[in-house]
């Protein structure tokens, strides 16, 4: 449900004159190789990186980063209204409670009513922390339908990160190295798929010359538990 708030702010940025990735998105769409679900995820990925600074969702939500609701138009008591107008964290949780599910039902009408009645006594930060499992690092989950191309999306993220990292080498938001983990019990089915990352054509998302340069620079190393243990300094 939280994604709806993020998506709205993301789309506002993409259509604004402040958006710095319009050319990248336009190229990807015109190239026609990535699927709609992949492109949508790339838009979100770039928004979280560039605009949100790769901050934890808990932190972004608490800062009111995705607030869009006009509190002045809400049916609230003066006490509740003043609280929500002056506390971005409170306003964020209130807006969250009013989100609609796919079937049209409100996400949490009980939470909405509780906020209205107890606006000044709620520990909003604690509730938001629980919503995001008390995670204090950037923990983003991109959920795509089966067969939508999750492996190639991972490859696209890697190449885009490297592209921006080269443009801004001192910007900690963009990564220079990557690690992908696969559960050992499923490695026979997952690892072959993950190896497709090495075969991804970066010209699907970046201009030919830029794509060739990145392709020449990137190095892949596939490790498994047995070979990694042999080369480690672990003493049993």
What are these regions (language model features)?
Residues 1-236:
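RecA-like P-loop NTPase motor core of helicase/translocase proteins
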